[in-house]
Amino acid sequence: MKQIYVVLTILLTLNANADWKPLKKLDYYGPKAYTLKKGVAYVEIRKYTETYIPNAAGSGDITKKKAVVFRMYRHPLSHFGSATKHAFGKISPKKSYAFKKGAYASLGPSAKWYYGAFMLDSAGKSWRLENIQDVTDMIKPVDTPADLSLVLWLHSDAQDRSDQKSYSAKYRKSGSGYVIREHHVAHGVGDWVYGCGDYLFEYKINTSGRVTQKKLIRKRKVECGGD
């Protein structure tokens, strides 16, 4: 009887694990992997960083940097005329529209950053997207791995997602939406807002791209500065 119970437990575990599929990181999917809603031609997300570097005089220098970190499009930016491209590149962010804000402080350099999203419509008019939901509204219904990866990235607090040993994600279908589990091991305070540790988060996402639930389902201690 005990052997039957063990076999059934193993089979149920295998069946449950079979429902999960690995979710690739955002840069795995190309900019044309997304089905943009009608009238949308091009969307990009920019990261704005302000770095303070102290000097011996007790003051310091501040440098500002802008970088495009994500694109999705029906037509690439090169499709548009030079005047449209120039106007789009010059459109400035609004702090009230910023998302994924972060900061890093130390005895030496410190930095703070935020992200902003921008859109070109099919007529070549530039728009600021006001929040995360505006971004996901560009692609809903959310129903592909690429869509899910974008929604996860928008809501995740992880700063460094490049190391497969310390970061991974998987997803499965659940009712009319999806469940994502995000695993992250942080060895430094700067790469995870919750500090050093081994974390497993679970997200519930509907096809409108809304995160209906985000919860920490596991946390383990990890030594800061370790490997």
Regions found by a protein language model. Name each.
Residues 117, 200-202:
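Hydrophobic beta-strand positions in blades of beta-propellers and related beta-sheet-rich domains
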Residues 20-164:
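Extended, low-hydrophobicity segments enriched in charged/polar residues
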